[in-house]
Every structure is written in C-alpha cells, then in structure tokens.
Amino acid sequence: MTETKRYALLEAADHPAALRNLPEDRLPELAEELRGYLLESVSRSGGHLAAGLGTVELTIALHYVFNTPEDKLVWDVGHQAYPHKILTGRRARLPTIRKKGGLSAFPNRAESPYDCFGVGHSSTSISAALGMAVAAALERRPIHAVAIIGDGGLTGGMAFEALNHAGTLDANLLIILNDNEMSISPNVGALNNYLAKILSGKFYSSVRESGKHLLGRHMPGVWELARRAEEHVKGMVAPGTLFEELGFNYFGPIDGHDLDTLITTLRNLRDQKGPRFLHVVTRKGKGYAPAEKDPVAYHGVGAFDLDADELPKSKPGTPSYTEVFGQWLCDMAARDRRLLGITPAMREGSGLVEFSQRFPDRYFDVGIAEQHAVTFAAGQASEGYKPVVAIYSTFLQRAYDQLIHDVALQNLPVLFAIDRAGLVGPDGPTHAGSFDLSFMRCIPNMLIMAPSDENECRQMLYTGFIHDGPAAVRYPRGRGPGVRPEETMTAFPVGKGEVRLRGKGTAILAFGTPLAAALAVGERIGATVANMRFVKPLDEALILELAATHDRIVTVEENAIAGGAGSAVGEFLAAQHCGIPVCHIGLKDEFLDQGTREELLAIAGLDQAGIARSIDAFIQATAAADKPRRARGQAKDKH
C-alpha cells in the first residue's frame, strides 16, 4: 500500500482549515493515521516520541474547535507538539526534524504562523498565553488564547506565578493541563465525561452566573449553600479546588483520548469568558505498547525498529561525560555521607539513575524548579552537608539570582555539575549551553573548571567537592576523547593550568574540550598549547609567562566569546599593560540552529579546521602589523 493510500485522510487534513472541513465522525480515523505516521517517521529519523503519541486526539480537537492561527495555541516545552507540526502543513518535512536545515525540535515562530510562541524550556506557556490574551483584549480582538501544559511543567514556579496573575485579570484564557503521569482513574470515565460536558455547557454556565448575581446580592446565605453544593459535586469528579481558588473555572479531569468528549468540552469552553482550566488525562506513548510501558525511554529516541520490543542498545565505548559524573557521584557518596544529589527533573539526562537507586535517602528530584533546587542546596550546605546540583547549563540560567544571592554571597560549598555545556546539537538554541562561563565568571567566590577529557572531569568534580565554597564543573554532551578515568581521586591545584605542547611564536590557551583540536593545530604550526583547566581563578602566572615569551596569544573555548574565558584572559593582560595581540575563538554573538554537535562545531569555527583557519588568519594579520613596527624600531636604532 502506498503512503498516500495509508495516510489519505491525513493528507487531506494537511492544514487546520482542511481539518475543520472533515465530518466529526471521521476524526477517530484521522487520529489513527496521525499516530501511525508519527510512529513511522520518528522511528526512522529519531526525535521526541512518547509525549506526542499522547497528544494526538487533543491536538486534533484543538485545531478542530479553535480557529488557528488566529486563535493562539501555546505548547509548553514543545516535546508534545509533533502532531501539531504534522497538522499545520509540515508533515512532509517531519523526517528532517532536529536536523541541520530541518524542522525545529520545538514550536518556533520563524517556522510557521501556527507556532505563535517559541518554546523549549518548561513552564512558560501560561505566562505567554496570558500576555497574548491581554494584548488581544486591549485591541478588542476576539481571539482565544490557549496554553497546553503538562503535569511536569506545572511543577515549575513560573507556571504558578502566571496562574496567580491570570486569576486576577479575568482574562479570556484557557489552560489545558495535559496530565500524562497518572493513570486514568475509575472516575475518569463515562460519568465524569458526562458531568464535564454539563458543567462546561452554556445552560449551566448562564444559570451559574445568573444565580451568583441574584442570590449573591439578595440572598447571600442561599448563594453560599448553592456554591458549596456545586463544589461538592465538582469535588466528586475533579481535584480542582486550587484552581477555583485562584479564580479559574475548573473542568475535568476528562479522557484525553476521547475525541467526542474533547470536542464537546472545548466548544463549550470556547464560548465562555474569563480564565478557564481544563484537566485532560492522557497516556504518554499511547498506541505503541513499548512506549506505553516505558515512556521515559521513549521520550527522546534515535532511529529504532518499530517491531522490536525495546530500543537498540548503545554501542560499547568510552563513557560519556554524563556517565563519568554519575560514576563519580556514586563513588564519592560511598566515601562521604555528607554528599547529597539534587536534580530539577533530569534524573536520566544528568546521570543520576544509579545514585538514586543506591542512595535513595540522599537523592532529591525537586521537579522542574531550578530556582528552588539551588536555594534548597544552599540550605543543606548551611547545615554542613555537601550538595551536588546536577543541572544542564541552559537550565542553570533560570536560577541565576539564587546562584548569586543564596550560594555565592554566603560562600556556601555547593558543587554544580553542569551538563550540556556548549553546543548540544539536535535540540537547537533553546538547549545550548553557550553562556555559563560568561554569567558565572563575574560572580565573586565562584570556582569554575572546564575539563578537557574524561579523567579531568572526574578529578575536577572531586576538586570542586572538597573546595570550601561554591564550585562549578562544566562539561559537554556526549563522549570525550577517550581518556579512561582513574579510579583514584586527586584534587588539582586550584587556579593552575599546564603546558601540553611547547612551541614558539603563538601560545594557544585552551579551556575545556577544545584542547584536543588546539593540540592538533599547535602541532602543525609549532605553537605552544596550554590546558588552562580553570576559568576562575585564572592561572595568571602561566599567562604572564606565555605573554612574555610569545608574539601572540589565542584563547579557545566552547562558550560565548562575550564575557567568557578568553575575555578574562584579555582583561587580565590589559590590567598588566601587556601589549601582546590576543585572538579569541569561541561562540559568536548569534544563536545557532539545530544540527549534530559536529555540524554545529564546524559552523561555529570550533572544530579543528575552523580553529586552524582563525589562527592562520591571526598570524598573518599580526605578522603584517609587525612589519611597520619593526621598521620604525630599526629607524630609531640608526639614530
């Protein structure tokens, strides 16, 4: 059977306008095709799978009921938005998702008018949708703003800040909680769906509002009794008291895979005004048994065999930096009972699975709450414990005030194990760790290290752990150059680098993983190459020595040039009145799209070839500038 025949209905509903022309009784068939196409495509290309499988019916219902793109759908994070991309004219390009020049991993305003807000980080959707609703109200535009947020996203403090604000504004906002963690309990069935339809209907809504005005004004006692009765009825089927107290009309929970219930309820809610909250229960990985059984494993996948019962095993090889961290954490925890492990909902990604199993009483997953994670660690440190916060570079940005105010200002011994530093690859600019050196370097009391290989990563983690103050070790995604970590742990002398290659003319100062490429270039041009190790404090003695014995200095880092490690070197040399030319190689003042890590390093000029080009050009430029200076010097000598 050809793809056209297998996905005939999906092809006919390639845009929301065409979808809305379909008879409602054809939508279950469309859902089946959409789920099948999503499975087939992602199994070939890789990508985020389980979340999207769980939102197929919800996505169809939203585009069927609301007039997108005039009505705004804001998807929180965006992992669950693959069905949305398919139904908004991007089906043919789905195989390119997360690839260089392909579809973005997340909703992206530059990609489609149906992506009304760019996302990638969690818990932002309610704030954005509320802003859109208020903007529309100011211009008297009759649009609907809908935020779709998962139960994980709702653990983020920003989501509750937005909920608190929305309830006070009486904005025309609908929030949909996509609850895919709890199983569908017995009360989420026919009775609950029926009651949700009634409670969201026009008749009930009008009676409720009329009763509020009439009884509330003339018979407040009767109104209070009626209100309590209503809450009692709602309480039998919905855990919505919190949202009602915040000023929302709460409906649900309803079955997120029942298209009839979804469409009826959404139509009713579309016709209401003010802040509304709909609780929808879905199953992550819906329709594909292995993903339903293990949604965590199938959250983000590479290419895999649909007929297999499990994902392919990764090829054996040297450990990734994440695995090096996970092993060190367990080894250190066995030696020091003061060690505590903290993660903001990234147990698997940050390498804490084994630690959580071996030391469950010392493992804390705080949810998507980076600000809380950092101050929580500060509180533990203030009581004599040694917390380790395992966090992605891009997510540490969300806790910057806490890093300064609660940790560094009090000089508390919190170790930050910063994963995904630098360019991360397929997830694109929302997940790149391009700025951590820049935003940490200016904070007093911080100790900042960047390992060049797996063994240095292990030893730096130990160095930071025993340090009496805040420390950070930042390392990239994936594997290193293949240096096997030593079982022993030895602290590096703080603020000391090492010369790895002796040459003349040019001194290359490498910070972190670019060292391997720098050494290869240094061998070719006969340069000196230093492994700096520490971004703060810098090895000032080594920098002065190299400045005094070389014609030029080059710094290399996988971080933004602005404010990064190279900037620190330049600032120090300027303060010492050294007139030596300096070239900074790093990430330029731009956001890079998605691609493989290797592709992005090449685009950024941080692969071996790119570093060589920059250094060759710098040598030529400084040599040309030296000729007039030498000529002037020779003329002075003659006089």
From Swiss-Prot:
Q: Superkingdom, according to UniProt?
A: Bacteria
UniProt record, GO biological process? 1-deoxy-D-xylulose 5-phosphate biosynthetic process; isopentenyl diphosphate biosynthetic process, methylerythritol 4-phosphate pathway; terpenoid biosynthetic process; thiamine biosynthetic process
One cellular component term (GO) for this entry is: cytosol
Q: Which Pfam families does the UniProt record give?
A: DXP_synthase_N, Transket_pyr, Transketolase_C
Question: What EC number(s) has UniProt assigned to this enzyme?
Answer: 2.2.1.7
Q: Which UniProt keywords apply?
A: Isoprene biosynthesis, Magnesium, Metal-binding, Thiamine biosynthesis, Thiamine pyrophosphate, Transferase
Q: Name one GO molecular function term.
A: 1-deoxy-D-xylulose-5-phosphate synthase activity
Q: Where does Mg(2+) bind?
A: D151, N180
Which cofactors does this protein require? Mg(2+); thiamine diphosphate
| UniProt-annotated binding residues for thiamine diphosphate | H79, G120, H121, S122, G152, G153, N180, Y288, E370
Family of this protein: Belongs to the transketolase family. DXPS subfamily.
Say what the protein does.
Catalyzes the acyloin condensation reaction between C atoms 2 and 3 of pyruvate and glyceraldehyde 3-phosphate to yield 1-deoxy-D-xylulose-5-phosphate (DXP).
Q: What is this protein called?
A: 1-deoxy-D-xylulose-5-phosphate synthase
Q: Which gene encodes it?
A: dxs
